[in-house]
Amino acid sequence: MDHITPAELALWRAQGHAFELLDVRRADVRAQHGADIAGARWHDPAAWLDWKDSISSARPVVVYCAKGHEIGQGLTTTLRVLGVDARYLVGGMQGWLAEGHAVADHPAPSTPPERTP
């Protein structure tokens, strides 16, 4: 199976299913929304060559983008070719929200300490 619905993902979470959740929304889209699906790790989709080898094949991976189209499906296919049990979230973040599932706010950006002369 190469996809998972928001309802199925919510059930996996409720049942404590072991999986990795990857947020691959473009940085500008992610920033506009201001929230993630709790537990997701964000990876810049444009830099996938830099992070693809860090994704473990030891457990399933759920990939979500903004709408569950090109970015999420494309990266899911790439990960599957690399031997990862990956599936994209149908409808992406938009589908997750449309079904009323909870999200978590982005952590506040860290600011460097002020320098005093």
Regions found by a protein language model. Give the residues of each.
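Rhodanese-like catalytic fold shared by cysteine-dependent sulfurtransferases
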Residues: M1-E20, V24-V62, K67-P117
